[in-house]
Amino acid sequence: MTHSRSLNPFWLFKTLVLTGFLLGSVGAFAKENNALDPAQIMVFTKTTGWRHSSIEAGVKALKTLGEKDGFEVTQTEDAFSFHPDNLKKYQLVLFLSTTLEVLNENQQKAFENYISNGGAFMGIHAAADTEYEWPFYGKLVGAYFESHPNDPNVLTAQMRVLDSKHPATKNLPLSWTRADEWYNYKNINPDIKVLINLEEDSYSGGTNGANHPIAWYHESLGGRAFYTGGGHTEASFEEATFLDHLSGGIAYCLGSD
């Protein structure tokens, strides 16, 4: 004769509680480890138009910032990196002086989905001279390049910080003077929140007038987006104040501000 043994309700309850505790502990451990993992940033430097000699200096500076601020940089010029399985590895995609058409239609769609689902974007300088026929990107970067002064193209100008509470500006002087190639912009996205205005009476060649944005952010497309117009020169990436500006922009994009 066989005897069936019913489970004691107390022991069943205790077993379930212990199992739940262990599973919860594993989940918490995984979350804690993920939180400790350095943020991953993809720095995209593909150019099909003008190529800035400052790109390499910019990549080097961003990697150095990563060592200080706790993020890792992967630099690529391969548009095939814009695949859903690859994009999901990164918390931020940064366009460093990219120019003209850099992604095909499928890659554009993958990037749109990445941003719509909360991925972050940051653009430096000629990121505004990129993908003129892609409306989503135009809104994402915030404005397109229209022109810049010539002979010389690099000029010293004064900027005015409009929002000193943002991570990208909180350590900047309210009146900031530096040398760079100052872009004039067109198709400015009305959703951008301007952080810094370029004072056109401080240099020659400005065409945007009294409202000449040079750094801004927005969150109108799903994820965080930040752009700064500086970074034409190699010297830019050796300036402590400009690097602090970039560091703050990255912190904002990563949500670590």
Locate each region found by the language model.
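Boundary at the C-terminal end of the N-terminal hydrophobic targeting segment
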Residues: A28-A30
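A glycine-rich, often tryptophan-bearing local segment used as a flexible ligand/cofactor-contacting loop or short
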Residues: E101-N171
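Helical hinge/lid and interdomain linker segments adjacent to catalytic or ligand-binding clefts
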Residues: Q40-T130
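Bacterial N-terminal signal peptides
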Residues: F13-S25
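Catalytic beta-strand/loop cores that center a nucleophilic Ser/Cys/Thr
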Residues: N150-G222
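Oxidoreductase and adenylate-handling cofactor-binding alpha/beta cores
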Residues: Y137-V141, R178, Y185-I192, T241-L243, ...
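Extracellular ligand-binding/catalytic regions of CAZymes and related secreted enzymes
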Residues: N33-A39, T45, T64-F71, E77, ...
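N-terminal secretory signal peptides that target proteins for export/translocation
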Residues: M1-W11
